[in-house]
Amino acid sequence: MLTGNILDIKHLAVHDGPGLRTTFFFKGCPLRCRWCHNPESQSAKPELGLLINRCIDCRRCQEVCKLHTFNKDGKHLIERAQCTSCGRCVNACPVNALELYGTRMTLENAVADALSDQAFYRANGGGCTLSGGEPLQQSDFAAALLTELKKHKIHTAVDTCGAVPWSAFEKVLPVTDLFLFDLKHPESAAHKQMTGLGNELLLENLQKLDKTGKPIEVRIPLIPGFNSTPEALAGFADILSKLENLTSVKVLPFHHARFKYQALDMTEPLKDLAACSDELAEEVRAFFRKNNINVSE
């Protein structure tokens, strides 16, 4: 039975393509962006999250799993190296302070979930978006899900970082109406410094994708001081100006996700960086407009 590792499903989403959409967030990503606002999506494995502000120190989790401990100050700790993400503690918690990130989902259940919102798609031109993480790391499941959705004439979109083999794109091309393609930085060295990988494969895939004729919306997470410099913006403009099937560029201002990192006992890499201001985001949008590049809000 074909299954996918799904982190979350968001209904009536408005930022993941045209109209109201059902967005499937796939778990697992090849990049480790230092600004990532979904750190729970990075690992392909299920993970246990602890929302410490909800914890009431009832210790029912400890009754079902000895990997939950409390130090002398009463701090709730988890022996994560030994955790198998079985979920027993999640079920035992009376206040939902524990969450399991990632679950195996059958193709049939995923399709049924998407079809439950079909009336909204019909009303406003919405559809389904596969996001992540990186959905094309699970290209077989992604292609199968998109194929079923197209049988119901549902608009489909794939949000990708592009850091996957071209063969993964080929599997979903026939059943994808729109690609949302993330660009982080035009220079490979800077890209590698902040994401863990260079950008050669991403740009190669973007060029190949453009030649297929599929519509592409490029998305740029705007990180102050990293890719907001004049040099970086000029590099972006050069890349975008050469795309024949670019519909628009969307600027995504950096913001913090501290509670998500805390839930996983992770340190937020850019915790000391100020969030992107509205003024900077608008300056960057104006730059692209000045260079005759369509900007989506």
Report residues per predicted region.
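N-terminal-biased segments
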Residues: G17-P18, F25, Q42-S43, E47-I52, ...
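Iron-sulfur cluster-binding cysteine motifs and their immediate structural context
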Residues: R34-S41, R60-I78, R88-R104
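Conserved AdoMet/S-adenosylmethionine-binding subsite of the radical SAM
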Residues: E108-A263
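N-terminal pre-triad scaffold of radical SAM enzymes
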Residues: L7-R60, H76-S85
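Auxiliary Fe-S-binding modules of radical SAM enzymes
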Residues: M1-P18, L222-E297
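Short gly/ser/thr-rich secondary-structure transition/capping motifs
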Residues: N5-L7, D73, D159-A163
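Short glycine-enriched, charge-decorated loop/helix-capping segments at active-site entrances
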Residues: L50-I52, K192-G198, D265-L273
